[in-house]
Amino acid sequence: MTSINEIIQTYDSILKVADKDAKESKRAYGGFLRSLKGKLQEYITGEIIKIAWHNLGGDEKRLDVNSKKIRVPIRLSYVHKIRETKVREYILQNIEKYHYGISVDKHIHIDGKFVMAIECKAFTENAMIKRILVDFHLIKTVCPNISCFLFQLESQLTGDYSALPKTVFGSVSTHSIMSYFEDVDLHIFTLLEGERSITKPIHTFFKPLKYDNVERAVKLLEGYLNEFV
């Protein structure tokens, strides 16, 4: 079982060589760093999930974390409103083919039951929140009882998301956008303190990943996973 200290050590070691690795990579500098930070956040979130379940005394064999596509079927109410008769009839005759596969970064299953979904981002701004909410909304049309989370390394949402207070009041813009997706009830957790700055990226202006905040993330998930132990 990976410990919180080991998560922090991994974060430190990767971020401190990220700039050098990006310059040596055959990939575009910016693209390499975006991918690296995204994968790092997915790793951290995955380990936090495991620690939370372990702390609750859950059997690791009962826990499955994946990102398999969720099949979202076409809505019949939409099909019946299609004005072009031939198009409408064609879709109805082939209705089993009409679906959309969608996923977020972490789908948490306990005993095969889908109970929680977590989107992982190196950072989030409000333009990205709209896409995240749409994804969760579509998933919840099929799996209405899951809990939805956004785990981000840094915040660019304004408000106090990046201040890491015990009670997060959020931002005017983010709450306004989320109010149009009432079925989602998105929980946003930020790991690094300080609003993201485009001119001060964390691979050159290092931000520490603090033990207490990772522990808070663990406790947050424990609160939602406890009923499934």
Language-model regions, residue ranges each:
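Nuclease catalytic cores
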Residues: R34-G46
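Active-site-adjacent loop/helix micro-motif of nuclease/hydrolase catalytic cores
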Residues: F123-V134, Y161
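Conserved catalytic cores of phosphodiester-cleaving nucleases, focusing on short active-site segments
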Residues: K106-I108, F114-A122, I132
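Surface-exposed cleft-lining segments at the edges of enzyme active sites
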Residues: G31-R34, A117-N126
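Substrate-engagement module of ASCE P-loop NTPases
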Residues: H137-T141
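Long, mid-chain structured domain cores
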Residues: L36, I48-I74
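Active-site metal-binding core of divalent-cation-utilizing nuclease and nuclease-like domains
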Residues: D64-H109
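C-terminal tail/extension regions appended to the core domain(s) of diverse proteins
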Residues: T2-G30, R34-S35, K50-G58, V142-V229
